[in-house]
Amino acid sequence: MPDSVLAVRLRDLVDAGVFVRVPYESAPPREEYRLTKAGLDLWRILIAIWAWEMRWVERPDVLPPLVHLDCGKKTSPVLACGGCGEEVGARDVVPEVGPGGSLYLTAPPRFRRRSSKDSEPTDPQLLYPQTMAILGDRWSGVVLTLAFMGVRRFVDFESAAGASPTVVSDRLRKLTDVGVLRRGDGGEYRMTEKGLGFFPVLALVVDWAERWMGSAGEPALRLIHEGCDGELAPVWRCDRCGAVLERRRVEFRLDPLRKGV
């Protein structure tokens, strides 16, 4: 990555509250980047991305296993409701637009224009290319969220997203190509099993955004767990011992042959 591009990305992450610059040398003055509390809390989303790619994406390489240090076993974590403890998936929740949100979603403005071609996840060095195809583009994430909320028809995607027909058509095509949406005979778009499997990522992104960027007491989107009729507070549970996972008690185990590469 060119230094100029890296500098822009680091600045954006600082502005978003994910990184903070900390001086570590005074002569000459130098700074290092450290994760904030909001940045550290992204670990739950990263595990969701890892788990989805492990389950649904054919890869030329093998992702490292996740180990739960408390039980010492490799885990395939399970998303659960923090209120009742039950396992939860896309079919177990009802999305509701909160007082701080609207179905007429609009993506935040971009300060630097980037073409659709430039945003294609074609770089073989990308660790999670299909996830980047969904989350790496602002409109793709909006369209997939709307599909999860029950939007089916093209005109409804266009109206709810507040995007141009060209943008909506392009993102629907990309999401269909990735395999998270399918287009039926009647022209409606529905989520595939692969798309429904992306629910933990969406749920944790919503939870993180409300926790660190939302207005106090005014959620933009609420996820109601039908099992307990409460608002979903997603947590990860170890599928081996059942305990709730904590950031400092899990780690990825790299292949010894790949260390230092």
Which positions does each model-derived feature cover?
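Glycine-centered, phosphate/nucleic-acid-interacting loop/turn motifs that mediate DNA/RNA or nucleotide
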Residues: 17-18, 179
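N-terminal helix-turn-helix DNA-binding core of bacterial DNA-binding proteins
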Residues: 1-2, 126-163
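Basic, amphipathic "hinge/linker" alpha-helix immediately C-terminal to the N-terminal HTH DNA-binding motif
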Residues: 25-46, 187-204
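Short, solvent-exposed amphipathic helices
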Residues: 41-59, 197, 201-215, 220
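C-terminal regulatory/oligomerization modules of transcriptional regulators
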Residues: 54-119, 214-261
